C-alpha cells in the first residue's frame, strides 16, 4: 500500500533527524512536528475513520508503530542530551581537591574539656590514677554511703533529679563523691586518685549556676594522712592553674562526708575572694562503709567545679556564656 510506504518513509526520516539533534529545544520542536496535533501522524490518524474496513487495521497498526518508534527515539535522545549537558557542566566545574584552601574554619575543643585535661595531667604526672563512675547513680552511693542522712535537704526533689520509677532509688548524681566509694572498694591501698565528670542539680540557669556542670574531685587514702597533706595538694594545684601569685585560704565548714571540713577560696589581690571548692579529711564513717581499717588508714578529699574555675582563670562574670554556645564567646578559645 502507498500509505504504508509513506508512513515508513516519514518514520525513517524522523528517526534520522532525531539522531542528529544537538539541543533539547530542537528536539522538542521535532517531536511536535512528528507527534503533535498538526503533525503528519495526526493527519494519518484522522484519516483512518474514512478508510475501508480492510485498510483501517493495517493503517492503524502502522500509525501506532510509527508513533511508538518516534516517541522512544525522542525519549532516548532527550536522556542522551541531558547526560551530555551534565557531563559538560561537571567538566567546567571540576575542583582540584588537592589545592590548598584559601580559608580555614578551624574548630576547637570546649574550654571546659581543655581545663579538665590540664588538671588531670597535673595529677597523673604526680602518680595519681584517674577513676570514673556512672552519671546515673544509686541513691545509696550518692547519699547514704557518704554519711548524708535520710532527712538531709540535699535529698529533696527540689535539689536532686530522681529517675523514674522513684522506687528504684536511682538519680542523676549530684556530685562526683560517689566515685570515692567505688574507688575505695575496688582498689588496693594506698590510694591516690582523681575523678571528673558531669553532675546534675535542680538549679535554674543563671550567672552563677547551671543545672548540669562539671566537678573534679581528688581522694587520698593512706597511712598518717593529715590536713597538711591536703592543704599542700590544693596549694600546688592552685599555683599550677592560676600562677604562683594566687592567694589561697581555707575556712572551716561542714560536709557530712569529711571531718574536719573546710572550704577553700582564691584571690589575686588578697582582698576579693572567690569560693573555689570544699575539702576535708574523709569521715571515718565513709571509710568504714568501704571496708577500710580506720585505725591504720586516714584520707583526705577535695572537690570543685570546673565552670567556676574557668570563670576565675578568664575573668568571666556569667556562667551562662560557657554553656549557651554563643560564637562571640567561643572565638576567644580558638573557634572561628
From Swiss-Prot:
Record's subunit section: Tetramer of two alpha and two beta subunits.
EC number per UniProt: 6.1.1.20
Which cofactor is essential here?
Answer: Mg(2+)
Q: Name one GO biological process term.
A: phenylalanyl-tRNA aminoacylation
Q: Which Gene3D superfamilies match?
A: Bira Bifunctional Protein, Domain 2
Protein name per its UniProtKB record: Phenylalanine--tRNA ligase alpha subunit
Q: Report which gene this protein is encoded by.
A: pheS
What are the subcellular locations of this protein? Cytoplasm
Which one of the record's GO molecular function terms can you name?
ATP binding
Note on how the cofactor is bound? Binds 2 magnesium ions per tetramer.
Q: What's an example GO cellular component term for this entry?
A: cytoplasm
Which protein family is named in the record?
A: Belongs to the class-II aminoacyl-tRNA synthetase family. Phe-tRNA synthetase alpha subunit type 1 subfamily.
Q: Which InterPro entries match?
A: aa-tRNA-synth_II, aa-tRNA-synth_II/BPL/LPL, Phe-tRNA-synth_IIc_asu, Phe-tRNA_ligase_II_N, Phe_tRNA_ligase_alpha1_bac, Phenylalanyl-tRNA_Synthase, tRNA-bd_arm
Amino acid at each position: 500500500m502507498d500509505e504504508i510506504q509513506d508512513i515508513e518513509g516519514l518514520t525513517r526520516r524522523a528517526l534520522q533527524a532525531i539522531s542528529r539533534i544537538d539541543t533539547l529545544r530542537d528536539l522538542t520542536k521535532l517531536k511536535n512536528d512528528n507527534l503533535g496535533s498538526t503533525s503528519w501522524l495526526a493527519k494519518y490518524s484522522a484519516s483512518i475513520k474514512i478508510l475501508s474496513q480492510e485498510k483501517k487495521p493495517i493503517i492503524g497498526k502502522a500509525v501506532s508503530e510509527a508513533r511508538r518508534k518516534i516517541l522512544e527515539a525522542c525519549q532516548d535522545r532527550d536522556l542522551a542530551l541531558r547526560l551530555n549537558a551534565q557531563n559538560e557542566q561537571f567538566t567546567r566545574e571540576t575542583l582540584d581537591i588537592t589545592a590548598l584552601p584559601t580559608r580555614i574554619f578551624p574548630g576547637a575543643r570546649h574550654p571546659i574539656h581543655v581545663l579538665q585535661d590540664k588538671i588531670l595531667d597535673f595529677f597523673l604526672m604526680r602518680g595519681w590514677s584517674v577513676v570514673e563512675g556512672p552519671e546515673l547513680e544509686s541513691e545509696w552511693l550518692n547519699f547514704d554511703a557518704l554519711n548524708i542522712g535520710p532527712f538531709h535537704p540535699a535529698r529533696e526533689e527540689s535539689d536532686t533529679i530522681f529517675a523514674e520509677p522513684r522506687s528504684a532509688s536511682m538519680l542523676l548524681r549530684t556530685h562526683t563523691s560517689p566515685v570515692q566509694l567505688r574507688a575505695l572498694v575496688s582498689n588496693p591501698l594506698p590510694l591516690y586518685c582523681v575523678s571528673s565528670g558531669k553532675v546534675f542539680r535542680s538549679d535554674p540557669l543563671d550567672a552563677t549556676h547551671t543545672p548540669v556542670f562539671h566537678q573534679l574531685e581528688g581522694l587520698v587514702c593512706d597511712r598518717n594522712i593529715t590536713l597538711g597533706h591536703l592543704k599542700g595538694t590544693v596549694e600546688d594545684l592552685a599555683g599550677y592553674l592560676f600562677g604562683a601569685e594566687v592567694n589561697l585560704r581555707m575556712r572551716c565548714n561542714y560536709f557530712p562526708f569529711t571531718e574536719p571540713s573546710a572550704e577553700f577560696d582564691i584571690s589575686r589581690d588578697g582582698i576579693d575572694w572567690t569560693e573555689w571548692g570544699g575539702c576535708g579529711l574523709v569521715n571515718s564513717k565513709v571509710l568504714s562503709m568501704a571496708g577500710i581499717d580506720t585505725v591504720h588508714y586516714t584520707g583526705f578529699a577535695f572537690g570543685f567545679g570546673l565552670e567556676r574555675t574557668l570563670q576565675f582563670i578568664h575573668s568571666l562574670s556569667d556562667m551562662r556564656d560557657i554553656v549557651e554556645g554563643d560564637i562571640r564567646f567561643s572565638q576567644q578559645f580558638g573557634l572561628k
